[in-house]
Amino acid sequence: MESDLEFSNIVSVLKLVEATTQRTVMAKALSSLLAKTPPQVIDKVIYFLLGSLRPDWEGVELGLAERLTLRAISMATGLPIRQVEELYKKLGDAGEVAKRAAEIKRSKGGGGTIFDFIDTGPKRRLTISKVYDTLMAIAKASGEGAQDTKVKLLSSLLTDAEPDEAKYITRFVIGRLRLGVADMTILDALSDAFDVNRDLLEKAYHVYPDLGKIAKTLAEGGEEAVKAIKVTPGVPIQPMLAERLSSPKEILNKLGGVAICEFKYDGERMQIHKLKDGTVKIFSRRMEDITNQYPDVAEYAREAIDAEEFIVEGEGVAIDPDTGEFKPFQELMHRKRKHNIKEAIEEYPINLYLFDVMYVNGQDLTDLPLPDRKKVLFSIIKPHEHVHHADWIITDDADSLEKFFLDAISSGCEGVMCKSVKLGSVYEMGARGWLWIKYKRDYKSELSDTMDLVVVGAFWGRGKRAGTYGALLLAAYDPDSDQFYTVCKVGSGFTDEDLKKLPQMLEPYKIPHRHPRVVSKMEPDIWFTPGLVLEITGAEITMSPLHTCCSVMLKGDVGLAIRFPRFTGRYRTDKRPEDATTVKEIFEMYSNQKKVKLTDQVP
């Protein structure tokens, strides 16, 4: 047992995490669990806690729908499928159904399944290896009869499980573990459990975002082994992020007087990798493998980039085939389909606009200044109809920057991205800093920019909205505390179609109480694990006693809130909750807003 861990240890922690609203309690429980986990299986423990068999970018899916999961519960417990389905209607949670069915089986001294009539000796306690390996076998089952194989494998696992174990295994299978244990929380727990510098772990995570691998490397090889983790083609790196300002003069001052400025296209950010064997992979901003959605872009990159191995970054933009004009981001949603991709390619063609290079032919370029990376990028791009360098200028003049910005807007772009050219202008993986600054005005709103906020709660509607959500509680992210602070309650901007699909979209995130990473004074009717990100605009940012955003910075019992918030119609499925607008950004927007008001009052 020394090289394995009884699954009951994990279940004890899961129960505690699910019940608590205190982040410190959750962190301590996770740290204690990882400290006693054998190195051989620490990766499996972490994957289970995160609700995924492998990192998201590997795209491993179990492929078991809820209906088939209920069948497996029926097989494992001997309860008729009709009774299991009735339990599901009553409880509304397949995990609770599995637990209740196991309890019924136990109370009857066995459920009459085939496993009850075979003398297998004393019942063996489940280990994480048994659970994980069986789940991986379910994911790998393919071909004729795969669904039956998956159901039988899950059934055999549930047969060996205690009621609470069955509950969490089932929730894992249907993708509703509902713990909200985030990557940053795991990094905190690893740092505490192994008494190592958290920054070291986070740096490795930015280079190689696989917490299972990082944990196993740390447990088996120590800090030096973690330091040896390098940028690897085929493994996405955490994208660099930008701050925001709303005037050319401020931007140039912040960047030291001169900047490279590029069009900020209204498309999908893409990190494109080519491996030595010729394989091309495309990763989204969320580091998910989206190659299958964009096989044309993969081929364009293979043709246009003159390097055996590379990692480049750019924006995939929908193009009108008749006029060559840019089309809005929403057009790319048609590329999300799993079928008829050929038709989608013809109907919604794409151009690729490259703006950075991070790796070429065995060389990690992330520590080079931006001008040096640009030289490399220009040297490897061959002329191609569908692949171009992003439109750009280098300037030290605010008027020139403003003119370039207006050119970008008139071309259908969101604005411009301004970047430092100084010696320290490295590619900061996973960091949001002042080396890159967004200049992006929303002319339809009094706010200088939109915000991407995370849904953490919902309020039931009244009147026409009775029976669905009337408003959502939204929060901004604080990377320093790894918590979400509420900033508005939004009910405007939603179409009838939005109101119809939101409950379904949010169902996987529903939890019985406030999540420990959410800081809120308001009490919505329904709480959610931070997950879904929405784009929001509004009139202005004001002080509010009802919200917690920036309350630490304001040093009082008030926070900041968005006045007259409105949903823009854009679901930011390309962003993780940790990629949402930060509390620091909102505070800066509030400060800039006050400066503008003061300026307007000057005669």
Swiss-Prot record:
Q: Which UniProt keywords apply?
A: ATP-binding, Cell cycle, Cell division, DNA damage, DNA recombination, DNA repair, DNA replication, Ligase, Magnesium, Metal-binding, Nucleotide-binding
At which positions is ATP bound?
E262, R269, R285, E315, F355, R432, K438
Q: Which GO terms describe its biological process?
A: cell division; DNA biosynthetic process; DNA recombination; DNA repair; lagging strand elongation
Q: Where is the active site?
A: K264
Spell out the reaction equation it catalyses.
ATP + (deoxyribonucleotide)n-3'-hydroxyl + 5'-phospho-(deoxyribonucleotide)m = (deoxyribonucleotide)n+m + AMP + diphosphate
Q: Check the record and name the CDD domains matching this protein.
A: Adenylation_DNA_ligase_Arch_LigB, OBF_DNA_ligase_I
List the GO molecular function terms.
ATP binding; DNA binding; DNA ligase (ATP) activity; metal ion binding
* Cofactors named for this entry: Mg(2+)
Q: Say which family it is in.
A: Belongs to the ATP-dependent DNA ligase family.
The UniProt function text for this chain reads: DNA ligase that seals nicks in double-stranded DNA during DNA replication, DNA recombination and DNA repair.
Name of the protein in its database record:
DNA ligase
